[in-house]
Amino acid sequence: MKTFLSIGSGPGMGYATAARFAREGFQIVLSARNPTNTRELADRMKAKGYRAEVRTVNSADPDSVATLIAEVEKLFGSVDVLHYNAASIRQATLSEQPRATILQDLAVNIGGALVATQAVTQQMSERRSGTILLTGGGLSLAPNSEFISLSIGKAGIRALTLGTFESLKGKGIHVATVTVSTAVAPDSDAAEAVAELFWHLHSQPIDKWTAEVVYPG
């Protein structure tokens, strides 16, 4: 059974994407900082007959992210699909934020994605297979000064994806992002649509691999 690891598993795109892969027979591992909320999501999945486990992770802490991936690889044998969905959404301009919150936001919004990608590619490279899915944002295309730390983070997600796409493809790893350019509520048609796009990216044959899809298109 293949394993899908979600980092930053919220009730919107995180849950919808995990459920989409669960329908295809994946073992799901949901992870976030708040284990109570994550367990509720896992219970919803189990009620539908899906396999779902819960882990706690601090996406701002590189050691926490790397330890999570190593634990999942040891327990289930592999991480076949990684979905990095963690984000710190703070409405504040650069001048309104103290240095500590800027760095904290960036640690979640891009730092955790960098660490997760680096950690998971080692075993994926040995297998010459794997998918890394990153939740992007329209702020990477049109930055907003009122959400400056998120804008920088989503720009980083896009750069990480496009900057590693070809090199990872040569190792059999598909890294891709859905650049989400609208607000997405839990249990919404939009969340389901984004999940479907992530599944589409994962399902592409290697000669059709793409790095980015924008939603809505």
PLM segments and residue spans:
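Conserved glycine-rich Rossmann-like NAD(P)H-binding loop of the short-chain dehydrogenase/reductase
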Residues: 26-40
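Amphipathic alpha-helical dimer-interface segment in Rossmann-like NAD(P)H-dependent oxidoreductases
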Residues: 108-126
